[in-house]
C-alpha cells in the first residue's frame, strides 16, 4: 500500500484527525487565514502552517499576505510557509523578510508545461492584467478569488440581488471542472491569484524554479 508522508489541507483540521495522522507518522501542514487558526493548528500538533493571504486564488480569507505572515510568524513556534501573491523571486525574498521559512506558489505553476489544466485556462491566466481578478461569495462568508468572466458577472449580480447561498451555489456547480477540463473560461470558474498579471509565459517547472531562486538569491545577497 502507498504510505502518505504529508497531508496539506485548506479545511479546518479537527484534533482527532490530527492525532490519527500523527500516529501514522504523517506530517501535517494546514493552510490558515488568521493568527487564531494558526495557534489552534499548532496546539493540535501541526508540523507547520501555510499562512495564505487574500491575494491567492480560490477560497480566501480577509488578511493580506503582507499583514498575515509576520503576525503568524510571531504567534507560533512551528515553521510558517507564506502563500498568496507570490510568483517570482521578489515575492519569495519578501516572504522571507516577513518571517516565513518557505513559500507556497500556486497560480504560476498552473501555467507550467507539466500542468494538465486545459490550454484555455493557462492562456486566460497568461493574458490576465493586474485588475482582472474578482472575489465572489462574500455575502455568505465563502469568498473565492477567480478571474472575471460571464459567470462571475452573473454571480455578483445575483449576490447584489440578495439571492440565497443555495441559489448561488447552484450557479457554480461544476464550473471549476468546466474551466479546468473543458476549457470554457467564459462560463467556468477560473481560479487564479492576483499575481496572474505578472505571469507572461508558459515554462517548465524546472525553468520557473531556477528563475525564481536565482532572482531570490540575488535580492537576498544585497541584504
Predicted segments — roles?
Residues 10, 53, 107:
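Short secondary-structure boundary segments
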Residues 25, 45, 85, 99:
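Conserved functional loop/turn residues at catalytic and ligand-binding sites
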Residues 27, 31-70, 74, 112, ...:
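Glycine/Thr-rich beta-alpha phosphate-binding loop at enzyme active sites
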Residues 19-32, 75-83:
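Short beta-strand/loop segments at the ligand-binding rim of alpha/beta enzyme cores
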Residues 1-13:
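Single conserved hydrophobic/aromatic residue that forms the stacking wall/gate
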Residues 67-81, 87-223:
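Conserved active-site-proximal phosphate/metal-binding subdomains
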Amino acid at each position: 500500500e502507498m504510505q502518505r508522508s504529508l497531508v496539506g489541507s485548506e479545511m479546518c483540521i479537527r484534533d482527532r484527525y490530527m492525532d490519527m495522522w500523527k500516529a501514522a507518522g504523517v506530517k501535517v501542514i494546514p493552510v490558515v487565514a488568521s493568527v487564531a487558526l494558526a495557534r489552534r493548528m499548532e496546539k493540535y500538533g501541526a508540523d507547520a502552517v501555510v499562512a495564505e493571504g487574500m491575494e491567492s486564488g480560490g477560497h480566501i480569507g480577509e488578511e493580506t499576505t503582507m499583514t498575515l505572515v509576520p503576525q503568524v510568524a510571531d504567534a507560533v513556534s512551528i515553521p510558517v510557509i507564506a502563500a498568496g501573491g507570490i510568483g517570482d523571486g521578489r515575492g519569495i525574498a519578501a516572504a522571507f523578510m516577513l518571517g516565513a521559512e518557505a513559500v507556497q506558489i500556486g497560480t504560476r505553476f498552473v501555467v507550467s508545461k507539466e500542468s494538465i489544466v486545459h490550454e484555455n485556462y493557462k492562456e486566460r491566466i497568461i493574458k490576465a492584467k493586474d485588475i482582472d481578478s474578482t472575489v465572489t461569495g462574500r455575502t455568505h462568508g465563502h469568498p473565492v478569488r477567480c478571474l472575471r468572466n460571464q459567470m462571475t458577472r452573473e454571480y455578483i449580480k445575483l449576490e447584489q440581488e440578495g439571492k440565497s447561498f443555495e441559489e448561488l451555489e447552484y450557479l457554480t456547480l461544476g464550473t471549476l471542472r468546466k474551466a479546468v477540463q473543458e476549457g470554457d473560461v467564459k462560463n467556468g470558474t477560473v481560479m487564479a491569484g492576483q499575481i496572474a498579471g505578472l505571469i507572461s509565459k508558459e515554462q517548465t517547472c524546472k525553468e520557473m524554479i531556477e528563475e525564481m531562486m536565482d532572482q531570490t538569491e540575488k535580492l537576498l545577497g544585497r541584504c
